[in-house]
Amino acid sequence: MKNLLSHINSTEDLRRLSVEDLPQLANELRRFIIEVIASKEGHLGASLGVVELTIALHYVYNTPKDLLVWDVGHQAYGHKILTGRKSEFHTNRQFKGISGFPKRDESEYDTFGTGHSSTSISAALGMAIASQLKGEDRLHVAVIGDASIASGMAFEGLNHAGVTTANLLVILNDNAIGIDPSVGALKQYLTNVKKGTQKQDNIFEALNFEYFGPVDGHDLKALSSELKRLKSIDGPKFLHVITTKGKGLRQAEKDQVKYHAPGKFDAKTGDILSKNNDDIPPKYQDVFGHTLLDLANSN
């Protein structure tokens, strides 16, 4: 069987594939991420969970003309690999390497610099309104997780978008977990939506979005078909996608908190490797924390 990923260096290459080829590509992309992150470290679980969604988005939408905004950026590894950075991916988060998050000066596909959560809806909405004002024929997509969407800034973006005619699609990547399991009333509501037991009116329709879903986020054929259909619908739209964080690596699916960013691990077994801390420089946050404690002790 011919390896597909090795022949993809741009989204144009991706869009030359048939829909029937996409599941094979998803398996290869997931394996590639696992093999690189096993030795180089990084945010594993989130990127494994959106492999199919990433492929479907770049397959259906005319990126980079159509603008795609990832919230936080933990899940952007597949996006980077498919948009011309496969050969550099081993330098991810390394000195003089590529960024671990979307970065505007790194690629035209990285439409917005991320790192902090809950900014994607406002950013994509601003781009959509700007395109409207300039008369540009562009589509705009924000991908946000179920933990990030519970933040105030996300609700501000939804609230604003709901009174516009902006051509905006918000995709909820619902895996019921951020770095830790999601909590709160919105999480309970989304759980009930997935079960079909919600008693309340649809919260997103109440904000003037057309709501679609839930959709299986690992069914490439269904995802691609739904995204293609939504391209023809004007105005604010909301697609609810159900995914599994850590998909494709048994341990990462089982312990989603630990495998959010597990450090080095065995790519075949998934077992986390013990660290030799003697050769590892301290992390910035640890230096900062210890410095604060030293200052507090002296004053």
Give the role of each language-model region.
Residues N9, N27-I33, S99-R104, L133-G135, ...:
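Short amphipathic alpha-helical segments, especially helix-boundary/capping motifs
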